[in-house]
Amino acid sequence: MRKISSYILLWMLGCLNASAASYTFDINKGILFSWEYDDLVGVYTTKGTRIKHWALAASDDGKTSSFSSYGWSLVEDKKYYLYSPYNSSYFVNDIPITELPISFEGQMQMENNSLTHLAAYDYMMGEGNTVGSSADFTLNHLCSVLRIEFVSPKSATYTSIVLKTSNDVFCREATMNLETQSLSATSRENHVELGLANIAVDEGETLVAYMVVAPVDLSGRDVSLTIISDNGEETNLDVQARELKAGKLYLINTTNNEGKSLSSKHRASSLTEPYISTSDIPIDRDSELIVTGIRQSKHNKAQDDGAVYTLSGIRAKQSSANGIIIRNGKKSLTNRGRN
């Protein structure tokens, strides 16, 4: 049988997702993306038959790369569905494209200010129709990302961060439906947790962490963010919450405008929601979320239980601040192979 080499060119404009992607944060541009060698995406046909999972060979700058595969080529006038990050179990277990399972459990950040773990949880999908021998995909981000900046009041080693409210509104597990381009929760909890791999932070230094959450409307709810150290000490932040939207980056910090640590006498600007942009043009101002209080406590965990987290009311006004651009754009897939 003759091998067919199909080369698929993927043009990136700062998209967030890939299973082996590289991420960086820029205060003016948001989260910037770069492909890594041998990254994978998954592709299905209209009927849900897996065609091929393409291996990515990144270009020098990581923005323009080629997917290559053997034994197939795009079929004219056919619809294709693409998802990322790649999951081999979908094919092994013959899971329908309407019920692809995803999970928000097990998020673990290994180092301070590291974004590496985002690649496994920043779920995206898109669809495209072939015109001639090419197909264009616009991939949609399904989740929100929180950037948490916490000025440590003393030298400590941190083990986890928990975002919590009083009801089971946070998506724990869900399914992706590539045909409807939607996400549906299959189980919910009242919190979402980011594990920290014993990250040591000196007094006065900043712990920077990233957490992925499914879109959720927290408007009017009591919401807390709990930062836990290895000796059981907890710092509980009251957060004025609102709707967390897909494809948005939110910033939570515990410093005021003078850069001082948050205390009972200081309030912190936080949780800026930017709009997705495909250019470097500054975006309009948008409302922000406020950290309204901070409390120190110590919780002695039982050996086999989960932590108990403190809740308190929301007490702050909304204000506006400059947004942070997440650069995103269309992924253009062009079949350059021949039958």
Regions found by a protein language model. Name each.
Residues 21-155, 206-209, 238, 245-248, ...:
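Short, low-hydrophobicity acidic/polar segments
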Residues 1-4:
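Positively charged n-region of N-terminal signal peptides that target proteins for export
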Residues 288-339:
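C-terminal outer-membrane/trafficking sorting elements
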Residues 132, 146-208:
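Short helix-loop boundary/capping segments
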Residues 7-15:
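Bacterial N-terminal signal peptides
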Residues 75-79, 218-222, 322:
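Extracellular Ig-like/FN3 beta-sandwich strand-entry sites
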Residues 47-55, 169-173, 232-238, 316:
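Surface-exposed loop/edge segments in extracytoplasmic proteins
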